[in-house]
């Protein structure tokens, strides 16, 4: 964080603008629910694909959602070196199709479990 602040200060000085940095929120990473991770893994594996786990400390909606209910995320492989939350973020149609199919499988399993 110190490196980012220092670079921002250099840029502001070079551009002759005033820079004010203020922390407005701090939240710990949201733990994913083990049962939901297992549901996602089963949905991905049902497509004949391996399921991988990925820790994420990013500021996703899950940081607040997990306070109200269990959560887990399905990450879709990204192009452009995996850049995320940026206009350069990109995914393939095939990977989006796989994500939708995994989601469909997960929701169908939930419906079956409830009936």
Regions found by a protein language model. Give the residues of each.
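C-terminal alpha-helix
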Residues: 102-113
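Hydrophobic alpha-helical membrane-association signature
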Residues: 3-4, 36, 95, 99-102
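A short beta-alpha structural unit
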Residues: 17-37, 56-63
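Flexible, glycine/charged-enriched surface loops at secondary-structure junctions
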Residues: 10-23, 50-55, 112-115
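Anion (oxyanion) recognition and catalysis
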Residues: 13, 45, 66
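Short amphipathic alpha-helices in soluble, non-transmembrane regions
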Residues: 1-9
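Short, basic, glycine/proline-bearing loop/turn elements
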Residues: 42-49
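Zn-dependent metallopeptidase/amidohydrolase metal-coordination segment
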Residues: 50-100
